[in-house]
């Protein structure tokens, strides 16, 4: 579903143009030997499979965007639950409805992800009843029949959920020990933030493309929707970061010393060597570590 429904344009993230609703030419192919950097469409068709023929070579073939895309489990639910195991190949007449339902489901599952993370924050205890209600309503919408699901007003529902997530964030960030006036910015593209105190920072929706965050302590920092493409997280401490998703890490750079919350993994393209041999990179720019700041402010919960 994820390789068919969305559209993408040729760019630094994708090697080709692909219209919405059209399968990627690498879908259902097997890899063929080719030089690094060869564009898409060089696989061998396998007769209708759902695997990516260049999955292990996506970055080398110019499909970085595929490696950082996260549907939050929406594709599986639409195929297995909403449409009872049928797919767009088995029921081509329903493909447009499937793709419309998928687009809605992805938004709802993304909201479920953030709501679940907010519900797990101890500091957000005063909001638990409202968060539980928001989870239940979002889940109810995601369980609607295909026709109703595709017609859900996602923007209206998001508008009711986002203020609640912001309140949860504010409560959690206020608990960061030693927090001064928190850093806040919506654009830190390419900036050197190694000496900036980012504990409890508000980086919601920030563009941090190529930002230098080496050794940064992001305890209690809210990174909801932050664009971390190419951001340098080597040696950074993200154990207490708020509202992180794996695809943000996949889009960034890091190393073996980058500290992550439980349940997250170091992307395969990250370096494995220490960035600063003999030092504790999490202390760069300030005198305190994540443990001294009160430990992890939240944890990653299971995907919905």
Predicted regions and their residues:
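Short, well-ordered alpha-helical segments
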Residues: 130
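Tandem repeat scaffolds
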Residues: 166, 174-292, 296-304
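Hydrophobic scaffolds flanking metal-cofactor catalytic centers in soluble metalloenzymes
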Residues: 1-122, 126, 134-149, 157-160, ...
């Amino acid at each position: 579903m994820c390789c068919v429904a969305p559209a993408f344009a040729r760019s630094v993230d994708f090697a080709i143009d692909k219209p919405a609703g059209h399968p990627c030419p690498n879908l259902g192919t097997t890899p063929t030997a080719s030089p690094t950097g060869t564009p898409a469409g060089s696989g061998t068709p396998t007769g209708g499979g759902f695997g990516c023929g260049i999955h292990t070579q996506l970055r080398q073939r110019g499909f970085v965007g595929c490696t950082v895309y996260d549907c939050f489990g929406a594709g599986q639910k639409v195929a297995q639950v909403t449409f009872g195991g049928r797919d767009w190949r088995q029921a081509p007449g329903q493909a447009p409805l499937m793709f419309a339902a998928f687009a809605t489901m992805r938004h709802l599952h993304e909201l479920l992800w953030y709501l679940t993370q907010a519900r797990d924050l101890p500091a957000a205890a005063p909001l638990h009843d409202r968060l539980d209600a928001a989870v239940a309503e979002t889940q109810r919408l995601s369980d609607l029949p295909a026709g109703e699901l595709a017609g859900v007003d996602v923007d209206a529902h998001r508008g009711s959920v986002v203020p609640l997530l912001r309140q949860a964030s504010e409560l959690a960030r206020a608990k960061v020990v030693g927090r001064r006036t928190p850093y806040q910015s919506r654009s830190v593209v390419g900036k050197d933030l190694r000496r900036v105190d980012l504990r409890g920072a508000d980086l919601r929706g920030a563009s941090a493309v190529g930002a230098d965050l080496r050794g940064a302590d992001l305890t209690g920092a809210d990174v909801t929707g932050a664009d971390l493409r190419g951001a340098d997280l080597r040696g950074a401490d993200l154990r207490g970061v708020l509202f992180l998703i794996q695809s943000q890490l996949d889009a960034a750079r890091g190393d073996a010393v980058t500290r992550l919350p439980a349940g997250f993994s170091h992307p395969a393209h990250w370096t494995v060597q220490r960035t600063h041999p003999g030092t504790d990179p999490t202390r760069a720019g300030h005198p305190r570590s994540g443990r001294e700041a009160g430990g992890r402010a939240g944890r990653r919960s299971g995907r919905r």
